Amino acid sequence: MANSFATRTFTTLSDLQPNMANLKVIGVVIGKTDVKGFPDRKNIGSERYTFSFTIRDSPAHFVNAASWGNEDYIKSLSDSFRVGDCVIIENPLIQRKEIEREEKFSPATPSNCKLLLSENHSTVKVCSSYEVDTKLLSLIHLPVKESHDYYSLGDIVANGHSLNGRIINVLAAVKSVGEPKYFTTSDRRKGQRCEVRLYDETEFSFAMTCWDNESILLAQSWMPRETVIFVSDVRISFDKFRNCMTATVISKTIITTNPETPEANILLNFIRENKETNVLDDEIESYFKESINLSTIVDVYTVEQLKGKALKNEGKADPSYGILYAYISTLNIDDETTKVVRNRCSTCGYIVNEASNMCTICNKNSLDFKSVFLSFDMLIDLTDHTGTLHSCSLTGSVAEETLGCTVNEFLAMTDEQKTALKWQFLLERSKIYLKFVVSHRARSGLKISVLSCKLADPTEASRNLSGQTRV
C-alpha cells in the first residue's frame, strides 16, 4: 500500500476466513446500496436500518459488507463515503456467505465470506486519495466481470422478449443523463428515478433506469458522449409502455465508469470519432416513431404553458409529453422550394446524401450498399390563442397518418391537390400529441416532435381549453 500505510497491517480480502477477529481490511468501494428500514421483530413498532456495499483490494478479490443499526448510525455511516472512495474497516465480523440466498440480491463475489459491521465494535474510515496506492484506486476502473462478457445494445434489441427478466452485463456509452425525479409511494415512502440513455456501435439509443440514490448520484457524474460504462448484472426487461427493451439497475448491479479494457477503448474511440461528425445526432432518434401509448398522455397545454415549461426545465435532458389543441399555421407541402420528402437509410434511418443516394453512416465501414426509402420529413408551426410553436418535427409514419396518404400517393398529387390538402388543416383545430425536450439549438427553446395529429372534436377541445386544469 502507500507509504502512509506501511506500518499498518491489513488482512487481504483473499485471506479472509469465517470468525477471524481483530483485523483491518482496506479496499476501494465499487458498489453501494441505499439505506433501507425494516420492522424490528424484537422491538415491535420500531425499525432497524441497513445498507450494504462492496469493496475490492485486488483485481481478483472483492467482498460484500453490510451494517445494521438504528437510523442515525446507519444513515451517518452511509453518508460518510461513496462509490470510488477508499476505506479502512476495523474489527468487522467475518461470516460465511450463504451464496444462493445472498447473491440473489447482492453482487456476486469470489469470496465465500462477507463482512458485518457493528456499531459498537467496527469502524469505517475514509482514506484521502493522497494516502492510497494508485494501484488500489485504479481498481475502480476494472469491471468485476470478464471484459468480453457483455451484450451489445444491438444484441439486446435483436433478442427482444427472449431476454425479458434476464440479468446480464452491458458495455455502452452514455448518451444523456436525465434529471432525477422524486415521488412518494402509496405507503408514503420517498422514491426517486433517473433515466440514462445509452448507445454503442449497434444501437443509437437505449434506456437504463436507476431507482436508487447511489446509482443516481453516480450517474450524475457521467459526461454524455464522453463516458463509457460497464454495467455488471443489470436487469433487462420489456417495457410495455414504450414497446421496447430497457435496462434497470438493481441491488446486484455494479457499474464501472470508464473501464480500462480493450473493448471499452474501442467503444471510446468510436464515440470520440462520431462526436465530431454528429453521426448519432438526435435527428435520427426523432425520426423513428416512438411506440408511446397515447392514452397515457393526459396533460393538456397551451403554447404559452409549453414555453413556460421550457424555461423551468432548462438544463434537463428528460423529454416531456403533452396534448395541444391548436391549428397548424404553417404547412408548406405545396411549396416547391420546401422539401418535405427525403431519402432515408433503411438500416439506421439517417437522411442519406442526395448526390450519391448512399448512406454515409452505414457505408462508412462497409462496402455493402444500404437501401434507401422515401419518408416525410417536414417542419410545421402550431398556433393557438396564446402563441405559436415554430419548427415542430412531423416525420415518417406520423406524417402519413396526419395527412392521410403515403409518400408515393403524395408525390403523385397535383399542386392543386396538395394545396387543398394543406387547407384542410389550416382551417381546423387539431388535437396534437407532442414530445418536447429543452434544446438551446431550437428556435423556441424546445425541440418538439409530433406523435399524433388529428382533427379535434370541437366539444372536447372547448372543454379542455376552457379548463386547462390538467397540467
Swiss-Prot record:
Sorted alphabetically, which InterPro entries does this protein's record hold?
A: MEIOB (IPR052469), NA-bd_OB-fold (IPR012340), OB_MEIOB_N (IPR056880), REPA_OB_2 (IPR031657)
Compartment(s) where it occurs, according to its Swiss-Prot or TrEMBL record: Cytoplasm; Nucleus; Chromosome
This molecule's function is given as: Single-stranded DNA-binding protein required for homologous recombination in meiosis I. Required for double strand breaks (DSBs) repair and crossover formation and promotion of faithful and complete synapsis. Not required for the initial loading of recombinases but required to maintain a proper number of RAD51 and DMC1 foci after the zygotene stage. May act by ensuring the stabilization of recombinases, which is required for successful homology search and meiotic recombination. Displays Single-stranded DNA 3'-5' exonuclease activity in vitro.
Q: Which domain of life is it from?
A: Eukaryota
Gene3D superfamilies for this protein? Nucleic acid-binding proteins (2.40.50.140)
Q: How does it assemble?
A: Component of a multiprotein complex with RPA2 and SPATA22. Interacts with SPATA22. Interacts with the complex BRME1:HSF2BP:BRCA2.
**EC supergroup of this enzyme:** hydrolase
Q: What is its EC number?
A: 3.1.-.-
Its main subcellular localisation, reduced to a broad class, is cytoplasm
Q: Which gene encodes it?
A: MEIOB
| Protein name listed in UniProt | Meiosis-specific with OB domain-containing protein
Q: Which residues bind DNA?
A: 167-272
Q: What GO cellular component term, any one, is given?
A: nucleus
**One Pfam family linked to the record:** OB_MEIOB_N
Q: Which family does it belong to?
A: Belongs to the MEIOB family.
Give GO MF terms, alphabetically.
Answer: chromatin binding; single-stranded DNA 3'-5' DNA exonuclease activity; single-stranded DNA binding
